[in-house]
Amino acid sequence: MGISLFWAVAFLSKLKFNGLVYGLDFGLFHPDGQLYSFRALTMVGNSETAAGSIVSEWYRSHAFKLNVIDPQSLHYDTHPLWALYKSRMLYPILSAPFVLLFGMNGMLIIPALSMLVLMFSIQAIGIRLENKYLAFALAVLISMSPVITRWMFANITDGLLTALTSLFVVSYMYIKNTNLQLFTLGAIIILGSYTRISVVQWLAICVGLYLMNQKRNSILLGIVALVFFIPSALRNLRTGILPNEQESGLLNRPAQLGLSMAKVAFYEVGQLVVLDRLLILMIFFAGAVSIYSLHKESSKYFLLVLLALWVTGAINGTIGVNFRYQLPLIPFMAYSILESTKINIEVRSRIKN
């Protein structure tokens, strides 16, 4: 009940207060959400012409950046990004019934539910670790984070991927039958592959599984992640990896990756210092306890996924997107904090006794 209340307050607050902050788009309808909205509208029976007009008119009055859109530019045979977005079908499919009922506002339902899944998942992690009160506090703090709510409630796929990642962590912790766990985690990876490019994240988790002596599941899940990534990679080999460096050629791009990673680290940390100091403190705390307790499962997963999402942001090539591509780190951050604080509480209790 408490989680739902704080989620509702966060969602209603976001509906009421959204716009530009320091020139950054904290609105609900983002530029790449145009394509997801267009696809959902065509799925419910609108022609491309009608869908383009609906999106164009809506963005003109409800978006804050790049809100002047030529309706024909959104058509499947016109927009240059459809090759990249073609495989990102899960969000439009799930949103289609809500778009049918509520129009363009229906595109906000899945992101809102994704936020609820994230918050309940953190509570579930805390219950499993017998640290439910701190888990509740973390979920509440996350619902108040301006950066997290910026992306989780917007009409983009990052919130959905974060929700799936949260379910992955919960399933990993609660399902002990290895075959059932393999099936469940594999299904989540497949669904995640249809949100946006997430293969680096999944492979990092598979490395963690391997280190936890779950070698069979690690290898099989890694194969699943690669198999469902390959079709997207083949369609977007030039534009999917450091798209801003297309002129340098594919062979030269690895050399650019290090520079891109340095830029991502500088801008992401700088933006969080300005916009969300509490979030960056939680991340640094999780990093510190993970390094200190490196033998723990949660520590390994947090550090591996942190590196993977850092690389993902660098590969994308868009600098200064304010933690957007690192959003799936949140459930692992909670996992690390909750496990480490539980251990410290137990140690202090034994000392007193």
Predicted region positions:
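Transmembrane-helix motifs of polytopic, lipid-linked glycan transferases
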Residues: I109-E130
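Interfacial juxtamembrane loops and adjacent helix segments
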Residues: T42-S87
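Hydrophobic, aromatic-rich transmembrane alpha-helices
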Residues: D276-L303, L309-V311
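Membrane-interface alpha helices of multi-pass inner-membrane proteins
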Residues: Q181-I197, L203-G208
